From Swiss-Prot:
Family membership noted in the UniProt record: Belongs to the UPF0102 family.
HAMAP family on file: UPF0102 (MF_00048)
Name the record gives this protein: UPF0102 protein Dhaf_3740
Domain of life: Bacteria
Organism: Desulfitobacterium hafniense (strain DSM 10664 / DCB-2)
Coiled-coil positions: none
Length: 121
């Protein structure tokens, strides 16, 4: 992955964390890594644990972030979430939700990135 894409991804994740906190959620973990992959953000809203994938794009040439979640990717996110819950020794599984936050950074002077939060992917 190019340095530019890595920087764009980090920027998008930072924006997403700010957005999540402003919405009143508690961020439990960022960039949770396990042998199965990585979960960008794990948050909590009330009794619900939310696993959040962040997709940041500067152009739509390869499709926007919200268009890029495949069934295979969702399945991987579910497996990572299962690992997280087992690793954190949850005795009973809490209510779970999987969300996507798509960030569109279109390099228009003075324009803030668009943040699209899709709950329950």
């Amino acid at each position: 992955m190019s340095e530019h894409r890595q920087a764009l991804g980090r920027y998008g994740e930072e924006l997403a964390v700010k957005h999540i906190r402003q919405a009143g959620l508690t961020v439990l973990e960022c960039n949770y890594r396990c042998p199965l992959g990585e979960m960008d953000i794990i948050a909590q809203e009330g009794e619900t644990i939310i696993f959040i994938e962040v997709r940041t794009r500067s152009t739509g040439s390869r499709g926007w972030g919200e268009e890029s979640i495949t069934a295979k990717k969702r399945e991987r996110l579910y497996r990572i979430a299962t690992h997280y819950l087992k690793f954190r020794n949850y005795k009973e599984w809490p209510s779970l939700r999987f969300d996507l936050i798509a960030i569109r950074c279109q390099n228009q002077e003075g324009k803030q990135p668009d943040i699209i939060w899709i709950r329950g992917i």
